[in-house]
Amino acid sequence: MSDTESPLTVLKARIALLATAIGGPDYTSQIDPPPYQIGDDCLACLKDLKRWFRLVDDNQRRWDVAMAVAEYKILTDDLLPILIDWENKCYLATKLSKGNSDISAHFKNKQYYDKIALNCLQLMVLMTWPLILTEQSSTNQINLYSELKKHQLTYKKAILSVENGKVLKAAIRIAIDVIKLDRLARTPRDNMVLKMVLNFIRNILAIEPGELTITARKNIASKGINSVDTLPPNVTQDDISQSTVISCFKKNKVFPFLLTLGSSMTKEFDQDFINIPLMEVMFFLTKDISQDSLLFKSGELDTAQSENHLSKAGQELNDLLQKESQLKKKVIMNTSTRHSRFGAMLSIQTLDQKRLTVSGSQNLLDNSKALQKIDDSKKSKGRRPMIRNETDNESLPTNLLNVHKKSGTYLPLTISKYLNDFINDFIDSSFNYLLKSVTNYFVTEEDKIISLEKIEYLLFFAWFNKYQILRCQVDKDADIMMISESIKETTFILVSSLLRSSYDSKAWAVVHSSMLAFNELLKLVNSLKKFEDNEDIEYVLSRLFSDERIQLLSNLPRIASTHSLSFMKTSIELTHTVLKILEMYSGDNSLVVESKRRAKKMKSISKEDYERLVNEEGYDPDEAIEILNPGHKTIVINFKRVQSSFFHRNTIDLYINTLKRFNELEYSHIKMIISFLYRLFVENNEETLFYRLDFIILLKDMLKQDGLPRTSKARTHINDFAKYYLSRLKRKLKSSPAWHVGILFPPLNDGVVGYFQKYGEHKMTKESEIYAVQPSQFIPFEQQEMMSENMILDMQIGVLVSTLIDEGSQNLVELVRENVQHLIAVFTSHLEVAGENEKTPNNEAFILKEEYDVNPLHYNRHIRALLQLVGFEIPILKSDPCFYRGTTEFSRLVKCEESITKYLNIPFETPNGLPSSSYLKQQSEKNNSLESDGWKGNEDYDYTDPNIVPDNEVDDNDYFKDLDKSTNIRKEKRTVGIASKKTQSKNKTSRNRKKASFRLPNAIEGKDKQPQENLEVFSKEYISDSDEDDEEILNPVFFENEMYMRWLLDKYNGQLPNDKFLSFGRFVNERLSNNGKVVSDFTSLFDGPVPPIDALPLEGITRKGPDKTLLTLSRVEINESNQDNENTQVNEQVDETSENLTINKNARNIGISHGHVESEADDDEPITKKRRTSAN
């Protein structure tokens, strides 16, 4: 095929024809320059262009149409003149109509021209849409990326400069025609027009120069390429700068249009169409703009006006001049005259008779520079860790997260004033509405949200929160509650869940933005101390102090040292804020959170009051207990324990690696780093983490002549810390000379060696000081953020009870329940005298009714966790008692007793369908990688942690032996109906499912190991799907229970209330255990007596009755299992090679025809099984 017949050539030719037919300058006119004249087929040509965009660029993942349109300059030569001419005609017609709504009399063929204007705007949105390269991008898109970016910069300049950006007025006029309509009269097409106008404004803001490189390694410097090479001809940075955009928006009334949409979002507009585009407009409008540059204190505005505010180019020149001045000082300091260069060569002979030579007089002044020059001359250099850029693998612009970049967007004073006024008006009128709408959209449409939208939402959230906090400090009339939606429960849950999910999926760009948003949220909560009675603030604070949250926040700085400097700074800021807030509520300043249900003021509390509330006033027992008890919940923060979770070696690496780049840090960041190091080194005496050679060299480099400037305030802090640090180091080297070698290597994690390094003596452990095992830790449930505390407690108890029953320790669960019931009786009796004696009950000890070879209170992880949930103080040492404090909430005790009793009688159903132990962290997960959220139980700084088993009780090879302890059920070659045997490690004894059995865990030695019998365990947990031995399917009671369930579901419109559901579970278990008989009273379940099974109609399903086919099917199965002759007759009628039993899980209309059960109501995928047709 010749070049003239290639598809691309044909495409360009057709685009050229369309460009010609749209219109052009009218050279017959006497006006100079000639006016634009649209063609006769202008509207059809514009529609054809839109079809080409959809057909080629959208469907084929190419940018050929966009490139051809750019080459023929359709936007600048056709679309802009058409829209501006339409705007001028509309303005003139409006002026001539003198306020009348109908201007068609002064504008002929207005509807036709309106359609042309709308199509022009649609094409402009397509042509200015942000270009993003992803892993799915085609070769064509990659090749055209840089050229199209330059063309979009040309579009941006033309839009902003042609007649002072009048095309923006035309776009807003199109939107105003829709706004004039009543909300109920608007069609979805009208709402899409509003969304399109917002997208057009968003596109103008988002167009920026392209990246220097588009490879995965974006941090590679491109030699010979600068920012000018990414700009097209005749376009400068000032033409497309943010200040130019803001000035154009001010002239063309874009800001009032945005305020109109934002302030009336929930009343006058369909918010689902405009919330995301409006958020993106606000994000790009404030991107890379410092909040401080927009705020002026009283008296500073006049000073700022007198100063010469430079443009962006001027500010960049000023920065370059400062760098040049610093370089000159270094050159003068290290340069000498030519006469002093003689005798300035140094030569060192090595052991292998080789020589290392350096020359230069500066090497005589500084030994470190001489050694550095020798290292630089080596051919092979050490492996350098690669610094990860968060946006590399997520197809995001590299400048998306430059929140800490010094050279941000510079705005002249007048432009700053324009933007400042608009931002203030937006916060006061629209911010809460917009944030609430976008948050609800993200919660409901979570699966549809892409990473870029998540980042935009989080950065939008962080920027406006920080701005309003600073604004309230400057302007006393500003109200911090104008951003009250930021502390709502839904917003906090969304920000927290984005942080958690992005950390788990290693989406580091979202993690970075989530840390920024969470940090600003905490600062906002901290600034709202005077509103501590606010329930939203109480909710945020109560959830902040959960163990899962602290684990996540302490893990973030551990992985930050391998990321960009901006990521490291954000992690340090977040850690600083978290520790500041936690310390505020530690010690005597306990956090008091009011419960959801207010406490009633009563003069005296007695058993009669409790019975009156339950029997006479109809309160539930839980509600009565909460009314009788104080309505406040006190959260006591163990700040020392929480703080220790941040004291990890990798966290120290983060702070030291960040401090190594002190020339790029601001004073505030250096102060945060020194504050953390002081907290760790001085206040907590964790010296061993700092005795390292690189840290000593870092302090020396910072205090050198070319280190921190002598005028810097941070130099004083560094100097004071260095003096104290060196004095402690000298003392440690004298008392423990082994540290002369120790500073060259990382500290050891071994408990014995680490203890000796830290204290200089061997660790002696007495029998009475042996620690008990660590309680089981939970893996968060699905959507745990949305659950209440009572629901989480109930599910955690269900997990532990079910796991203990599976392990054969049901007797221990019953023992816990007996103790809890005894406590309830003690507390109830105490209520009788509470009115006269306000003393709290005495502490009650846990009672073991029988002797155990090994105390389960010390060595059963699940029992210890269960006792901890109930409220017991579990023993840490062997000599410690286990008791229940009298000050603990009585309502929690009652709830725990009910949950334990419930799950002893009803099996616990896990949300994920796996065994309940899947929600418990295994022992081998305690010391997993840094990416996990678990506490580091054997960290080098925490040798006295009571949760750690002493080293004299653990074999040195236990770490390697633990690798073989996982017992996975083998799926292949499984015998039907017989469970495969679980493999046991040599140190781990078997667990027989007997009530009196309890074995010593592998952390304890010296006990005889009992042999494991080779038994074949018959368990339905491991039976493969087969109907040959499926007794449940053959049991008629099973089908009858199904009939009752469907009858109840139909009665309650497909959803049973929670109390009915629990009652039905007891009803089902009782019928299965009693072969269909019912002994208990289930009147509340059926709102009357239990209907007999025969009383239910036998015909097919109707909307008012359950399906009776299951009853017929159960009777058929009984006959098949009991009568061989009838089975033979059935086999003669049914072809066993083609007969299938199809049961639809959700079907309501089921009929039997020729041995088949087929669904007629639902379209779900059926579960098909072969029906047994042969006699037993």
Swiss-Prot record:
GO CC terms in record: cytosol; replication fork protection complex
What protein family does this chain belong to? Belongs to the timeless family.
Signal peptide range: none
Listed name of the protein: Topoisomerase 1-associated factor 1
- Subcellular location field: Nucleus
What does this gene product do?
A: Forms a fork protection complex (FPC) with CSM3 and which is required for chromosome segregation during meiosis and DNA damage repair. FPC coordinates leading and lagging strand synthesis and moves with the replication fork. FPC stabilizes replication forks in a configuration that is recognized by replication checkpoint sensors.
Task: Enumerate composition-biased segments (Polar residues).
Answer: 915-931
Q: How does it assemble?
A: Component of the fork protection complex (FPC) consisting of TOF1 and CSM3.
Annotated GO biological processes are: DNA repair; DNA replication checkpoint signaling; maintenance of DNA repeat elements; meiotic cell cycle; mitotic sister chromatid cohesion; replication fork arrest; replication fork processing
PANTHER family assigned: PROTEIN TIMELESS HOMOLOG, TIMEOUT/TIMELESS-2
The intrachain disulfides are none
Give me the gene this protein comes from.
TOF1
A molecular function annotated in GO for this UniProt entry is: DNA binding
**Claim: Ribosomal protein is one of the keywords in the record:** no
List compositional bias (Basic residues) regions by residue number.
Answer: 983-997
Species of the source: Candida glabrata (strain ATCC 2001 / BCRC 20586 / JCM 3761 / NBRC 0622 / NRRL Y-65 / CBS 138) (Yeast)
Sorted alphabetically, which keywords does the UniProt record give? Cell cycle, DNA damage, DNA repair, DNA replication inhibitor, Meiosis, Nucleus
Sequence segments annotated as region (Disordered) = 375-394, 915-949, 974-998, 1148-1176
